Amino acid sequence: MEQFHGTTIVSVRRGDKVALGGDGQVTLGNIVMKGGARKVRRIYNNQVLVGFAGGTADAFSLLDRFEAKLEKHQGNLTRAAVELAKDWRTDRMLRRLEAMLITADATTTLVITGNGDVLDPEEGICAIGSGGAYAQAAARALAENTELSPREIVEKSLEIAGDMCIYTNHNRIIETIE
């Protein structure tokens, strides 16, 4: 059976502001199954943003586990991410999950990879998913050459990725913490 795949999630941090956004397309093979999926959410009393890419069921499973880790560690984003990554590497069932997460709070942005790695992005910019490289390149160029806000950079980056990646559409959901 084919896997659901394809999306773009991008995050930009500037100063004390962070934006995290994603498109809404869910693709199965060469068919668009849904155009308005919500892949970016606020969790932990609206203090943490999370976006996910990869297999839909896998992503939701990881999201649930990540929320539980946040609760256990009183909202400490880094600790929750590291603990999730440890579980991901040691649990046989989790190792089979094909998904990635970007998480952000008021001070920290992290990428949690399918290998169980936790990455702190350079220059406060990161992206995942099939259109991630397009969005990240656009975000870096915009951040280096404009005074746009993180939200504006995320919006424009997703627009560019949607123009270039067949698995990314223009239905965007963007969340911010300021």
From Swiss-Prot:
Disulfide linkages recorded for this protein, renumbered to the chain, are none
| Record field: catalytic activity | ATP-dependent cleavage of peptide bonds with broad specificity
A GO cellular component annotation here is:
proteasome core complex
Report the subcellular localization: Cytoplasm
| Gene3D superfamilies per record | Glutamine Phosphoribosylpyrophosphate, subunit 1, domain 1 (3.60.20.10)
| E.C. number | 3.4.25.2
Q: Which GO terms describe its molecular function?
A: metal ion binding; threonine-type endopeptidase activity
Residues annotated for Na(+) binding in this entry:
G162, C165, T168
Alphabetical list of InterPro entries matching this protein: ATP-dep_Prtase_HsIV_su (IPR022281), Ntn_hydrolases_N (IPR029055), Proteasome_sua/b (IPR001353), Proteasome_suB-type (IPR023333)
Where's it mainly located?
A: cytoplasm
Per the record, the domain of life is Bacteria
Task: Please name the top-level EC class of this enzyme.
Answer: hydrolase
**UniProt entry keywords in alphabetical sequence:** Allosteric enzyme, Cytoplasm, Hydrolase, Metal-binding, Protease, Sodium, Threonine protease
GO biological process annotations for this chain's record? proteolysis involved in protein catabolic process
Q: Which residues form the active site?
A: T7
What switches its activity on or off, per the activity regulation note?
Allosterically activated by HslU binding.
Q: How does it assemble?
A: A double ring-shaped homohexamer of HslV is capped on each side by a ring-shaped HslU homohexamer. The assembly of the HslU/HslV complex is dependent on binding of ATP.
Q: Which family would the database say this protein is a member of?
A: Belongs to the peptidase T1B family. HslV subfamily.
Give the protein's function.
Protease subunit of a proteasome-like degradation complex believed to be a general protein degrading machinery.
Identify this protein by name. ATP-dependent protease subunit HslV
Organism phylogeny: Bacteria, Pseudomonadati, Pseudomonadota, Betaproteobacteria, Burkholderiales
